[in-house]
Every structure is written in structure tokens, then in C-alpha cells.
Amino acid sequence: MPLYFAEHKHTADTCPTKQPEMMQMLGQHVSQENASKFGIQIHSDVVLPGQHHLMMVLAAPTQEPVDKFMQPFSMVGTVEVTEVRTCDQVVASGRC
């Protein structure tokens, strides 16, 4: 299944931690149980502390469900989704 790098950034002013209900909703949203409803497997999710920056590695059949899964984050900032490959995949294919 293809891998996707999903990146979300927001400002200190729009940070979801300022809105407990938004924080709870997004916290529940970024669960494997919920991601499975979109046909997505979460490989990794990390936040850069104090930088208002979330990054996720997700597996999905196509980019469309990833875009839909990341939609709620666009309420408070930007979202970018890019198809990626593992180093092993690049080595095996001989192409970057």
C-alpha cells in the first residue's frame, strides 16, 4: 500500500490546545480506530513541541482518503500531503 507524508502547521493563535473541545476532537480523530474508517493505517505521528507542527506517515490505497482524513486540521492551519517511499523501496527500484 502506498505511503503518504501528511504535514499540518498552525500558528500559536490558532493552536487547538486553546480550545479543549477542538483538542479532544482532533485527539480522537488521530487514532488508529478512526483512521481505519478511512482505510488508513497510521505508521507514525509526531508533533514538534512548541512549533505547532504535526507530521504523520500514513498508508492508504490512494491519496484521496488521506486528504479526507487530514481535512479537520485545515480548520486551524495548513495541510500538505505527499506520496513517499521508504529507503528500502528506493533501493529496490533503483529510482529516487
Roles of regions detected by a PLM:
Residues 56-57:
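Conserved RNP beta-strands of RNA recognition motif
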Residues 66-74:
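Short amphipathic alpha-helices in soluble, non-transmembrane regions
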